[in-house]
Structures are given as C-alpha cells and as structure tokens.
Amino acid sequence: MYLRLASKQSLNKNNNMRLFFSCFLLLSIFNVFSQETTTLENTSKVKIDSLYREDQFYFGFTYNTLTNKPEGLSQSKLSTGFSLGFLRDMPINKNRTVAIASGIGFSYNNYNQNLAIYKSDQAPTYSIIDPETSFNKNKFSQVLVEVPIEFRWRTSTYESHKFWRIYGGFKLSYLIHDRSIFEDAQGKIIVTSNKDFNKLLYGTYISAGYNTINVYAYYGLNSLFKSAKIEGEPIAMKSLNIGIIFYIL
C-alpha cells in the first residue's frame, strides 16, 4: 500500500513539472512574437511620420542669349552664366509631393556681343561695332542677388531620392556689380557701375527633369537696360538663359 501511494505521488510530481515547462515555453514564444510586432509597428510609424524636405540647395549653368536686340546687334561667341543658392522647401500636401519654395541666391551672367560701351564725359555711350572692325573681346557681365519663389510638383517618397520634378516660378534679381569691356589691338576700355543698367530685374523660369539631370530656362520680363539709347532708340534687350540645374539636400 505504501509503495502504491509513493508511486502515485511521484507520477503527479512529474506531471506538474511537465505542465510548468510547457507554460514557460508558451509564454517565452508569445513574448518573442510580441517584441517583433512592436518593432515592426515602430519602424512603420517612423516612416509615416517623417517630415522630409527636398531640393533645398541648387546650382546651375546656363547659355545666355539676348532677345529684342537692336538692329545690327549679334552674339558671336558663347555667353555663359552660373548660379547657386538656397530654397526653403515647404510641402503643402500630405504626401509632400506638392510644395512651394522661396530663398536667396547669387548669379553671374556674361554676354558676348557687338554692342560697344564707352564713357564720354563720364556718361556711357553705345554703338554697334562695324563688321569690318577687328577686336579681341567685347562683352558685359553682371553679378546679381536673386530672390526666387516657385511652385513644385514631384514624385518623391521618403525612401528614395530619385524622382521626376517640374518646378516653375518667378524671380527678382538685384544688380550688385556690372562690368563692360572692349578690347582690340590698341588696348582695353572698361566701364563699371553703369547707371544705365536696370538695378532690379525680374522674370519667370521653369526647371524639369529626373534625379540629377534637370533642364532649366529663364526669361527676363524687363529690359537689362534702364535708359540706354543707340542712335536715339532705347536699348530694350531682355535675357533668355537656358541650361541645366542641380538640386541637393
């Protein structure tokens, strides 16, 4: 009788141990799955809540042409420009694919042409260089502070920096330095701080492209010159600049 009772107690003890280990194993497995689910949920939340911005720094290169030119004026050499600046990106929709942006930048524009600029009695004078006249260089250049404001559409996502974009806007530019130079075999004539240049320029622009490569075009809405005349006629030339632009960060 005693042996039967001891055997029964031992069997109950073994069953209790098995039950304890089974419960412990189930709790451990549940805890692991719970931690993985929480990690995935947190990762998902980070991506959804990320308030990213795009294309806040830019630099570009342009080929500069002149429109509304006086009769006889031509551009015979390559005229180039360079610009760089900062734009604050401000998304206006939930997916952050539509935005407005505004900022500040600098540009340098160079125009090679055959409009000679001289100074006579401290006042600038202008003339079209005769085609038979030999000269080495004739150009004017400008350095401007730019204030662009633009509307932006793009296919960007938080995960990728490769996307299509179309940006268009309006730009104010303030002239801070100008220089005209005529050079021939006899020497150079240099004119700076020409009061006939328009100090405040404005125009529209557009840029479009994918990832790194974007085409850019700017059209000036007012004349480069404010009060310059040639043979009694106002010089009302405007700028048309076409090139490429790069956006980063």
Whereabouts are the PLM-identified features?
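Short loop/turn motifs that connect adjacent beta-strands in outer-membrane beta-barrel proteins
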Residues: 43-54, 91-98, 156-164
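Residues that define the transmembrane beta-barrel architecture of outer-membrane proteins
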Residues: 53-55, 76-82, 141-147, 198-202, ...
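Predominantly the C-terminal beta-signal and adjacent terminal strand-loop region
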Residues: 193-249
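Bacterial Sec-dependent N-terminal signal peptides
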Residues: 1-41, 246-249
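Residues on the lipid-exposed face of transmembrane beta-strands in outer-membrane beta-barrel proteins
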Residues: 84-90, 104-106, 145-153, 168-172, ...
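Short glycine/proline- and aromatic-enriched beta-strand/turn motifs that initiate or cap beta-hairpins
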Residues: 35-89, 249
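Transmembrane beta-strands of outer-membrane beta-barrel pores
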Residues: 61-67, 104-112, 153-155, 170-178, ...
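Extracellular/periplasm-exposed beta-strand and loop segments of Gram-negative cell-envelope proteins
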Residues: 70-77, 111-121, 126-142, 175-185, ...
